[in-house]
UniProtKB/Swiss-Prot annotation:
Name listed for the protein in its UniProt record: Protein nucleotidyltransferase YdiU
Pfam families in UniProt: SelO (PF02696)
Gene assigned in the entry: ydiU
Cofactor(s) needed by this chain: Mg(2+); Mn(2+)
Domain of life of the native organism: Bacteria
Reactions catalysed according to its record: L-seryl-[protein] + ATP = 3-O-(5'-adenylyl)-L-seryl-[protein] + diphosphate; L-threonyl-[protein] + ATP = 3-O-(5'-adenylyl)-L-threonyl-[protein] + diphosphate; L-tyrosyl-[protein] + ATP = O-(5'-adenylyl)-L-tyrosyl-[protein] + diphosphate; L-histidyl-[protein] + UTP = N(tele)-(5'-uridylyl)-L-histidyl-[protein] + diphosphate
Species name: Ruegeria sp. (strain TM1040) (Silicibacter sp.)
Family listed: Belongs to the SELO family.
Binding-site residues for Mg(2+), renumbered to this chain: 245, 254
Length: 472
């Protein structure tokens, strides 16, 4: 008996130019590593046996109603346009409407080659699968819009990268997999009919209140403003903010070389392929604006005379930096307990970040430490913090119940890079205890639990992760 998934597919009903129908490639010996029961319940999926789940989410069996396909898109990668990308190692099984009434994609990552694989094997190895499983679910628990992880399956096959590594498949759930790059490819090809169809589909699926292409542009802008400001507030560095990784739905998507900062610095980069620092922590807001400009460039092609809407489209894009700064300040004011807006708040936040960078302070523990009185301990030379703290306490005296605001704005736990790497190393050796412990701890990131106190600690000198890798 195959798994019962209540598919209700709409993307597969679009014209064939948007995708290639592609079944996942079966694997040798699928074994279920993890299954997200709460998410499955939300999706209306009744839990089968581990063997049934492994067969379906390993790609060996197609449930009734699945209509697997690989999506086509293009994208700017580190600022350079690639005219055709597409799902090179993933297939969209289909869509479901959850018990909350929201439509979501179910996609297998690492499911084998597709016509868009570009000489790749279409597979994923265990490390990136577990990284995305842990980090995407941690982001969800932090309240940040994100794709989610439904299942992880070991394939029983070896994937060859720098050496032989255990293969795995991730089941990713997303509001959709529409990207800025999905629009770019049809605009670049001059296929206005496809671009119009895609725009109408995106509006109907994500922003039904939006009026036309510029209404969609404005809605995507506002969603990205909230998303990127949320990233900044927890020290998250996406690492590869290419336009093919910029979600129309406003979700965090593609966790390849992502990282969370330990020691704060605005220029921090982890991704091994980001050699120029294009996607550094502090650059993320301006890259979001750049990506929106690429979407605007695509969408104005829907007009017979693009120049006629260029001014309005430009205004929508040019408003984004101020919106980002406002959203950023709102989130960081909350992190230091400020509800009421007052002159000097921007300077107060900026000064704290400046002395954190100078004092090599841990990002997460400093902000949480403002609540529990341990922030000073994070600084190599705390004298500058002492001066700032005096100013802050004076400002805080005008606030009502700042502790409650700070408690829900500053996580105790984040998926620290060294803990992720340790978990992956253990899992490759067959030990999943660290994975299960991380999943449990990070599901309640704002709770200070003694049994997880070790997960709060920054890395020791020999544990520091200097670079992260896509893992593809």
């Amino acid at each position: 008996m195959t798994l019962d998934i209540p598919f209700d597919n709409t993307y597969a009903q679009l014209a064939p130019e948007f995708y290639t129908r592609q079944a996942p490639t079966p694997v040798k010996a699928p074994r279920l590593l993890a299954f997200n029961d709460a998410l499955a319940t939300l999706l209306g999926i009744a839990r089968g046996t581990d063997a049934e789940l492994a067969q379906v989410f390993g790609g060996n069996e197609l449930p009734e109603g699945a209509d697997p396909l690989a999506q086509l898109y293009a994208g700017h990668q580190f600022g350079t346009y690639n005219p055709q990308l597409g799902d090179g190692r993933a297939v969209l099984l289909g869509e479901v409407v959850g018990t909350d009434g929201l439509r979501r994609d179910i996609q297998l990552k690492g499911s084998g080659p597709t016509p868009y694989s570009r000489r790749g094997d279409g597979r994923a190895w265990l490390g990136p699968v577990l990284r995305e499983y842990v980090v995407s679910e941690a982001m969800h628990a932090l309240g940040i819009p994100t794709t989610r992880a439904l299942a992880a399956v070991e394939t029983g096959e070896t994937v060859w990268r720098e050496g032989g590594l255990p293969g795995a498949v991730l089941t990713r759930v997303a509001s959709s997999h529409l990207r800025v790059g999905t629009f770019q490819i049809f605009a670049a090809r001059g296929n206005t009919e496809a671009l119009r169809s895609l725009t109408e589909y995106a509006i109907a699926r994500h922003y039904p209140e939006a009026k036309g292409a510029l209404g969609l542009l404005r809605a995507v802008r506002d969603a990205q403003v909230e998303l990127v400001s949320a990233w900044m507030s927890v020290g998250f560095i996406h690492g590869v903010m290419n336009t093919d990784n910029s979600s129309i739905a406003g979700e965090t998507i593609d966790y390849g070389p992502c990282a969370f900062m330990d020691v704060y610095h605005p220029n921090r980069v982890f991704s091994s392929i980001d050699r120029t620092g294009r996607y550094a922590y502090g650059n993320q807001p301006q890259i979001a604006v750049w990506n929106l400009a690429q979407l605007a460039t695509a969408l104005i092609q829907l007009e017979d005379d693009p120049e006629s809407v260029l001014e309005e489209a430009t205004e929508i894009v040019h408003a984004m930096p101020e919106l980002l700064e406002d959203a950023w300040l709102r989130r960081f004011r909350a992190k230091i307990g400020l509800r009421e807006v007052a002159e000097g708040d921007l300077e107060l936040v900026s000064d704290l970040l400046g002395i954190m960078a100078q004092g090599q302070a841990d990002f997460t523990n400093t902000f949480r430490g403002l609540l529990d009185g341990t922030a000073r301990d994070q600084f190599l030379e705390p004298e500058a913090f002492d001066v700032w703290e005096s100013r802050w306490k004076d400002r805080l005296s005008r606030e009502a119940d700042p502790e409650a605001l700070m408690a829900r704005s500053n996580p105790v736990l984040i998926p620290r890079n060294h803990r992720i790497e340790q978990m992956i190393a253990a899992a490759v050796g067959g030990d999943y205890a660290s994975f299960e412990r991380l999943m449990d701890a990070l599901s309640h990131p704002f709770e200070a639990r003694e049994d997880y106190a070790d997960l709060r600690r920054p890395p020791a000198e020999d544990e520091v992760v200097q670079a992260t890798f896509c893992g593809t």
